[in-house]
Amino acid sequence: RNKGVVEKFVEFYGPGLHQLPLPDRATIANMCPEYGATVGMFPIDDITLAYMRSTGRDPAQVDLTETYAKAQGLFHTENTPEPDYSDTLELDMTTVEASLAGPRRPQDRIALAEMGRSFHSAMNTVYDKPVTGSHGGAHIEMDGQDVQLDHGSIVIAAITSCTNTSNP
């Protein structure tokens, strides 16, 4: 968003492309509303075709995809010259770290390594509640045992995107 990609078509390219599995590419492309773009896309390449094969696509469809992309100059290899874009943004993929959104807004990113500390801090400062022993906990029976659920108990993971369900 800081780059100003709102209403833009964003294509990902570069030397790190071949290190990124297709499910990760799909997740990044599907998140374009979060980074403000109209669309996020990756070029068709061997990883795309391998994914199509591994997910049971008709071999004729895979061949057609490859043939068409190559005929149109859309098939990407490591030797493909860098396209001429109107603007670019460089991202060092070694700086990307796993993170979570919250506690209240998706843009409030929390590094996964900091999640435990951040959770305890948010419970105390944002919600004014202790993590354990606070009103609102619940007792449930699980596998024949009584279990206490408190704030912070992990009971379900919510996945909010159809693409992310295939790449949790």
Set out the residue ranges of the language-model regions.
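Fe-S-dependent hydro-lyases/dehydratases of central metabolism
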Residues: R1-P168
